[in-house]
Amino acid sequence: MSHSPQNPSSPIAPGDARLDSASFHRNHEPIWAVLSRWFEDKPGNVLEVGSGSGQHIIEFARNAPHLLWWPSDADERKIESIEAWRRHAKLQNVEAARRLDLCAPDWGLSAADSATLSDLTAIFCANVIHISPWP
């Protein structure tokens, strides 16, 4: 992708729900360089906490089609962006985005999602800690 956003998270184009994150362009390659060694021969489910624009999970799902990726975010605008990226990419190994609130006792998951996500290969999180709310 050659587009470089002006703002930290801006729409790709007017009317397009896909957000384009500056941090994705800066760090998806070095993050994948580390993750790929760990994920290369492991099957299973990977939950991304705080998927933001959705660009990282789409890129990583392309690179690791043997894994089933579960995007999540607490922000509805980000959920919309993740879903727009998912539709655009047409990957079979990316689940629908879940609204996930790590501050909630059950993370706000349905019983079905809780059961599925109790068997994870990994939980991945990047570009979140510095913007997380503190009690």
Annotate the PLM regions.
Residues 42-52:
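Conserved class I S-adenosyl-L-methionine
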Residues 59-109:
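Class I SAM-dependent methyltransferase SAM/SAH-binding core
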Residues 124:
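A conserved beta-strand element that flanks and buttresses the S-adenosyl-L-methionine
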Residues 106-118:
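Short amphipathic alpha-helix with an adjacent loop that forms part of the alpha/beta core around
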Residues 131-135:
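A short, conserved alpha-helix within the catalytic core of class I
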